[in-house]
Amino acid sequence: MTRPYFTAYETRKPPVFAPMSARQRAIWHFLAGCAVAAGAYYLQWRWSASLNADALGFSMLVVGAETLFFLGTLLFYFDFWDEGDTPPRPYDGAAFEATSGAPAPQSVDIFITTYDEDVAVVAPSISDAKAVIAPEDMRVQIWLLDDGDRADMAQLAKHHGIGYFARRENLGFKAGNLRNGLLRTSGDLVVICDADTRLLPGFLQNTLGYFSDPQVAWVQTPHWFYDVPPGESWSDWIVRHIGGTPAHRLVRLAAAVLTWITGRGRIGADPFLADPTVFFDVIQRRRNRNNAAFCCGAASIHRREAVFAGAIKRKSAAVGRLQTRLRQPVATCLRALPLQPYRFHVSEDLYTSILLHEDAAAGWKSVYHPQVEARMLSPMSLTAWAAQRLKYAGGTFDIAAHDNPIFRRCLSWRQKLHYGATFWSYLNVLWAPILLLAPMVSLTTAVTPVKAYSLDFFMHFLPAVVLGELAMLAACKGYPVGPGRVLGVAALPVHWHAFICVLRGQKPRFAPTPKLPLVGGGLRHVLPHLVLLALMSGAAAVGIVRTALGHTGFSAPLLWVNLFWLGVNMTLIARLVPMAWWTPPEARQTEETQTEPEAAHGACQLAN
């Protein structure tokens, strides 16, 4: 057997995420204010002076979608407004007890969770966990938590001399697996790792100090996918295929245009838009200022006391409610309800974060540590990408529908807005299709959402769009925002699937994200995209022909404006299609690939 594909990236070094400078902050705040003013001015004009009276329903539908997007923008601006890093503290046991008034942690358990991952994926995670540097007075123990009860995992744990716990039933998904480990260990602090999470040696050195504050419940560190293909710059690609030099003005202009259209600075780089830098260094880092950075599972470290204290409170309340309803003895109710240190849910990390944040009596805090302390594998197939997006969306929709933190009394209004921004970003499945399909309607029927595509329209519309783009670029510290825009459109079919499942009263239950490249099965994930692209192409052809024939209502401004937006929408949709046949170059010469498992399809099943 040849080496796994990801060994080609072993020498990569993690990025260092610098804080936002005062100048960057001032520019961002100025542009945000301008964008909000321009957006409000545009919407005021849209509602009061631009509605098409001949197609009022269609016109109001479009401007309603625009308004909802603007409200989402306001939420995200609050989300992104400013950084608030928790000052890092070096760990010192004696100083810990002096400042916190509590005994210093004496032990740490490192949990590596696995279900169906290969030995090739899990073994490096164990080796790196063994290399983590710990304080001299700190006992560190590593445990492999196997939800697949596999002999090769038991043998792997034995070979490395680490602890091993297995389960034959999978009650509670990953949260149940973690509970199984928690109930059989005793570490004061618990590090959570997925099967592919490879801790860096300084993980404990750089995170333990935060726990000198006795109210800190967990510390989350960024996810860094070290195997994302680097790709090739557009300039080099143009030179290689067409000629010229990278410094030539036309080459640079063409490269800039291709970057804007595709949302990618390099061709072949990050094919599945997996790079989480914007989420972690922009969103999570800035939520930290309001104690609202939530746990993302892997590469986080937790205080056992906080996790169990919250679980005991919740179980006590649930037992009381059950006893009142069923009028059964307390002992019977206790046996009927499992203790859930991490909430039994497909999004156990987000759910448990909400529950701990709302515990006002305990006053638990979360800390987002902004520097990379672990490396992981990214989705390396369209099936893996779809499984991951389906899991995220299904879990988020389920929480929003059945236990929405917006209505929890003990969360601060700031925390509610931060969590609300997360839910809002998924709820755009309800209004994004309106703006996606509106150009098709106009091109085939000559029905427009505005009175006319006049100079007045462009004077209101262009400032709002341009300032909004500039503000987002400033907010993201120069990180590319195109991938996020592409992802928002490309993932709509997957998010609709998850939304319908939850709407039908089904609980999301999905297979783990495959950790190795998959062969085959990608085409079915882009069938909705291909159908939509065909319909959009047909609409463009109809619009061109009817305009050329001079049909009533068709005009050059209508044609060009809607062709432009249709082209933008088609570019966003088409971005995912080539990925159905993509495999990493390293995997093409190795045996470390998998055929697509049936379980990887992802489905919403009734909760067991």
Describe each model-derived feature in a short phrase.
Residues 1-10, 388-408, 497-508:
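Short, charged cytosolic
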Residues 1-83:
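Hydrophobic transmembrane helical bundles of polytopic secretory-pathway membrane proteins
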Residues 14-31, 111-113, 118-122, 408-431, ...:
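Loop-to-transmembrane boundary segments
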Residues 27-29, 56-61, 287, 292-295, ...:
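Membrane-entry segments of alpha-helical transmembrane domains in multi-pass membrane proteins
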Residues 37-67, 425-509, 524-598, 608:
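Membrane-embedded multi-pass helical conduit in multi-pass membrane proteins
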Residues 68-406:
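Internal catalytic domains of large membrane-associated glycosyltransferases
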Residues 87-101, 116, 128-130, 197, ...:
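Alpha-helical membrane-embedding segments
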Residues 382-385, 391-395, 399-459:
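C-terminal or late-domain output modules
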